Amino acid sequence: MSRGLGDVYKRQELMCELREKMGTAIMLITHDMGVVAETADDVLVLYAGKAVEYGSIEDIFERPKHPYTQGLLNSIPRLDEDVELLNTIEGTVPAPDAMPAGCRFAPRCPYGKDRCMKEKPGVYHAGNSLVSCFRYEGEKE
């Protein structure tokens, strides 16, 4: 293990120990889904500063609902596969002064519709998760 990875692992262990000892929560903001998988109980996924999905660590990793969450998890390289190119999410994050009127992910979304570009989605129940996506508008708890 390289020095840098060892330091990260030690800090991660320390955070978990402190959480247990003090009976507190930890808010961890990161793109490192490996750290999230090892540390978190619940996950709030943000895209361009907006919450798009909330659920347990199991639901987020095993049954992601929001297209951004799905794309994010699909972009993680697998250790059991040899690939030349990593999976990516098409497009780019909009500039802060050029956000779409509707869903911020709509221009990059494989399921995006005109409605998504024009209207902001509410928050809907999808299984045990909460998701901000019109695809789950009609689902029941």
Range-by-range predicted roles:
Residues 1-9:
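Single conserved hydrophobic/aromatic residue that forms the stacking wall/gate
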Residues 2, 27, 97-101:
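Short alpha-helix boundary/capping motifs
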Residues 10-84:
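P-loop NTP-binding/switch modules centered on Walker-like glycine-rich loops
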Residues 57-141:
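Short catalytic/signature loops enriched in Gly
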